[in-house]
């Protein structure tokens, strides 16, 4: 992977892992309402489910690459379009709602959430088909990057859980500006896929 593509990969994965989504909002809410210690079961369920979903995404993306390598080029364009759409949604979205507090959930509920979490499914397929498979189709790399994607996602969840009220205050005061900055960084990622 070239340094420019690697920088786009890291920018995309970190922004996606750290922006609001079902996992991050649930981690934030669980830690804010019940404390970090009580939210560990939720985080553990998310992490294991995230890993399983990333491995499933790897299987799907890898299978498509083996069936027809031209599909990977097409998926790169689809991935870039998705990143631009995500940038638009982030730039035009209001600041996070600090009053959203779901009831406490446990390990299995947060594990099961991963299989219907469109954000992480698109995150996995986009990252693999856009940044990895055009460079290599070595199965060990695809699996390794899938594990890395799950670790990056877990990092984002833990950050939101640890930050608790700090993130809520920051989004309340600077949410709009932060969304625009994150959106511009995602546009950078989409451009870097091809240049």
Curated annotation (Swiss-Prot):
Cytoplasmic side: 33-46, 91-104, 163-176
Membrane topology according to the record: Multi-pass membrane protein
Compartments where located: Cell inner membrane
Annotated GO CC locations: plasma membrane
Source lineage: Bacteria, Pseudomonadati, Pseudomonadota, Gammaproteobacteria, Enterobacterales
Species whose genome carries this gene: Salmonella typhimurium (strain LT2 / SGSC1412 / ATCC 700720)
Similarity comment: family membership: Belongs to the Rht family.
TM region(s), chain numbering: 10-32, 47-67, 70-90, 105-125, 142-162, 177-194
GO molecular function (one): amino acid transmembrane transporter activity
Keyword Transmembrane: yes
Record protein name field: Cysteine/O-acetylserine efflux protein
């Amino acid at each position: 992977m070239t340094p420019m593509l690697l920088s786009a990969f890291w920018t995309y994965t970190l922004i996606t892992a750290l922006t609001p989504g079902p996992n991050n909002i649930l981690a934030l809410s669980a830690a804010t309402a019940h404390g970090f210690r009580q939210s560990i079961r939720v985080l553990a369920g998310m992490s294991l489910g995230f890993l399983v979903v990333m491995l499933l995404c790897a299987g799907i993306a890898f299978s498509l690459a083996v069936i027809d390598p031209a599909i990977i080029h097409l998926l790169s364009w689809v991935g870039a379009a998705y990143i631009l759409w995500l940038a638009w949604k982030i730039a035009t979205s209001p600041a996070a709602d600090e009053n959203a507090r779901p009831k406490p959930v446990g390990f299995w509920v947060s594990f099961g959430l991963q299989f219907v979490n469109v954000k992480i499914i698109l995150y996995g397929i986009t990252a693999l088909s856009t940044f990895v498979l055009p460079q290599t189709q070595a199965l060990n790399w695809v699996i390794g990057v899938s594990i890395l994607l799950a670790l990056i996602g877990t990092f984002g969840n833990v950050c939101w859980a640890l930050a608790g009220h700090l993130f809520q205050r920051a989004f309340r005061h600077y949410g709009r500006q932060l969304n625009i900055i994150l959106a511009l960084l995602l546009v950078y990622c989409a451009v870097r896929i091809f240049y």
